[in-house]
Amino acid sequence: MAKEKFERTKPHVNVGTIGHVDHGKTTLTAAIATVLAAKFGGAAKKYDEIDAAPEEKARGITINTAHVEYETANRHYAHVDCPGHADYVKNMITGAAQMDGAILVCSAADGPMPQTREHILLARQVGVPYIIVFLNKCDMVDDAELLELVEMEVRELLSKYEFPGDDTPIIKGSAKLALEGDKGELGEVAIMNLADALDTYIPTPERAVDGTFLMPVEDVFSISGRGTVVTGRIERGVIKVGEEIEIVGIRPTVKTTCTGVEMFRKLLDQGQAGDNVGLLLRGTKREDVERGQVLCKPGSIKPHTHFTGEVYILSKDEGGRHTPFFNNYRPQFYFRTTDVTGSIELPADKEMVMPGDNVSITVKLIAPIAMEEGLRFAIREGGRTVGAGVVAKILD
């Protein structure tokens, strides 16, 4: 049979399963794909196909991730599931799998466990905006009061990490029953309830092209008689000829006007997210712009030097450091297109960070970078990547 052409008529949303080991994340992933494939078309996935997740590299870090696609009545979903806890940590921090929302799987028989808490904290730190809970293995709990207790515990845990615990949809079911074809409340019905929650609780994400204009500077040229051209890939939004823009980061912010957009040596009247373009800037000298700055819509993004971040430090096997680092460690932080030196302050209870650890840190950079919460960065030493991180909170 010929492979069906992928019709993207429905809006696209990225989700993933998170939660403690053996609470049923992969079984649920298989159950969702199987139940929804039968109803809306698509490929059913077996547990083993998902569990044998292939290795991929993101920012030089090896991560095992399984990708599954499925459709609901209203949307197309891309869903990530990781086999091991370390893979989740790496995935969420590097943004290899950007999630518009997460499905937290928690066993009704066990209640919240250490990784349940850690994944909720990670989701908060890396900016996963929405969490839906699937209370799994409900077929193993016959005491309604116990179910209520577990639900309460999960809601409290979500609230503790600044998610709206009281308003979070919690679906009770059994991924195993659903995967076995059970049509009851805990089986297929629960999966359809989960699909409804995904459709209604997670808003459709803004497309990159609808965002405010932002382009990291990759290169700067001077063209005699025409002025200064800055090249890069537009990260989000649209830039039209004649629009005023700001140059932000490293130096004091300045305003300029875009007088031309070039792509593949052709002149255009606008450039948009995803385009590799050259922008001609009026009255800007070549030495006024450098790699590592960004061009953006005036007032939309500010330069900062001080922030907290969640970082993963590569293990020795991943080509990272062989030794731990301590407070006031000063590596380079690679943001978008350039390195900036910064010093790391560790949490009070942490004396050192070992290769392979993840940790919350406070960073002070020596030069300001155009920064927003959720921005990803690499930590480097002499051009070699030793860690990956994400901006959790801007301090000033």
Curated annotation (Swiss-Prot):
Instruction: Give the residues the record marks as binding Mg(2+).
Output: 26
Q: Name the SUPFAM superfamilies for this protein.
A: EF-Tu/eEF-1alpha/eIF2-gamma C-terminal domain, P-loop containing nucleoside triphosphate hydrolases, Translation proteins
The residues the entry assigns to the signal sequence are none
Q: What class of enzyme is it?
A: hydrolase
The domain of life is Bacteria
Note whether Ion transport occurs among the keywords. no
Protein name per the record: Elongation factor Tu
Origin species: Cupriavidus pinatubonensis (strain JMP 134 / LMG 1197) (Cupriavidus necator (strain JMP 134))
Q: What is the lineage of its organism?
A: Bacteria, Pseudomonadati, Pseudomonadota, Betaproteobacteria, Burkholderiales
Its gene is tuf1
